[in-house]
Regions:
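Catalytic phosphate/metal-binding cores of nucleic-acid and nucleotide-processing enzymes, i.e., regions
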Residues: 273
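Structured, helix-rich domain cores that form ligand/interaction pockets
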Residues: 1-270, 278-330
Length: 330
């Protein structure tokens, strides 16, 4: 397998705490000034703070403040944002360190954890997986199976297979990550990149956190979960599906999973660098017009105006960038 495993979603609740800033500093080890304040929430919380795919929900309904505490929810983008901006570097990878902190802390529970396994070696074929599901060649206690096929005119544009119900505590999703991530004008859109995501909620999420903290080998843990949850088999005349032979391609994939490691901090651009790219793409032509029409002095005036209007969050982003890359002021 050419890619390692990644944690692609993490949600946890810190009970007996009401201050979101305390949670951001104590658990995420991030500058709370990076986060924007929102007058909306989710999961029964009325307010939130937000930064790059990380949502911190707080202020639950009256009477449940300590019971519900503060909830942190990080999407896949949020997990990468956390890796980029956190100061939490103990115990190897930042996410591993955060998971260990969740595990050892009182009144802290993981409510969702997604583990993503990527296949770039052509071990998994989405059409073959979908055909196996449709023909009943899946040995699993999970009864709900769903297949989605998308088309671009008459051409197939993607297949997604779900094993498990949307609201269940455990669900597996197979999909084409390259087609999700890239535009069809990008040559990488056509590469083989099939992702298997294991979505764990409730006790399954808490159990996975404990297992990660008590295991030095994430690959073996992931392969053990897969072996327990499902297998693709070759049906024969035997009515007992558990006695059917497991498909070689699935055995090869699970064996490959056993060898993967949790990916270390992904090489993703800092949010400030993405702002620079936006300036180049969207603003540079207008700046060149101003320069030709009025000269550089007007541009300096615009820059000074921007400095005066800089928000607390923007200043925090600059400070974070300087800390990450050890940039000195000139």
């Amino acid at each position: 397998m050419k890619s390692a495993a990644t944690i692609d979603w993490l949600t946890f609740t810190v009970k007996m705490v009401t201050d979101p800033v305390e949670v951001i500093k104590r658990f995420l080890y991030m500058d709370s000034n990076l986060f924007a304040d929102n007058d909306f929430g989710k999961f029964g919380y009325r307010k939130s703070m937000q930064f790059g795919g990380i949502m911190v929900y707080y202020d639950p309904a009256q009477g449940r403040k300590l019971e519900m505490g503060v909830c942190v929810s990080m999407t896949g983008v949020g997990c990468r944002t956390f890796e980029q901006h956190t100061r939490l570097t103990a115990a190897g990878t930042p996410l591993r360190a955060l998971i260990e902190q969740i595990y050892i802390s009182d009144n802290v529970h993981c409510t969702r954890l997604d583990l993503a396994l990527d296949d770039k070696d052509k071990l998994l074929d989405l059409d073959r997986i979908a055909d196996a599901v449709e023909s009943g060649c899946v040995n699993s206690r999970i009864r709900k199976r769903t297949i989605y096929r998308t088309y671009d005119n008459a051409n197939a544009a993607g297949t997604t297979v779900y094993i498990g119900a949307p609201a269940s505590d455990f669900r597996i999703r197979f999909y084409d990550k390259a087609k999700e991530k890239y535009e069809n004008t990008d040559e990488r859109y056509y590469m083989h990149w099939v992702r298997l995501e294991m979505v764990m909620r409730g006790k399954n999420a808490d159990g996975c956190v404990a297992a990660i903290c008590n295991s030095d080998d994430l690959g073996l843990l992931a392969s053990a979960i897969l072996n327990d949850k499902l297998a693709f088999v070759e049906r024969d005349s035997d009515s007992n599906i558990s006695r059917c032979h497991i498909c070689k391609w699935w055995l090869d994939f699970v064996d490959a999973v056993a060898a993967v490691k949790l990916v270390e901090k992904e090489d993703v651009p800092h949010k400030l660098e993405r702002s620079i790219e936006w300036i180049k793409d969207q603003v540079a032509p207008s700046l060149s017009l101003i320069y030709d029409a009025k000269g550089f002095f007007l541009i300096r005036e615009v820059l000074a105006l921007g400095f005066d209007k800089r928000s607390r969050q923007q200043q925090a982003l600059l400070d974070d960038y300087r800390n990450c890359y050890h940039v000195e002021e000139v």
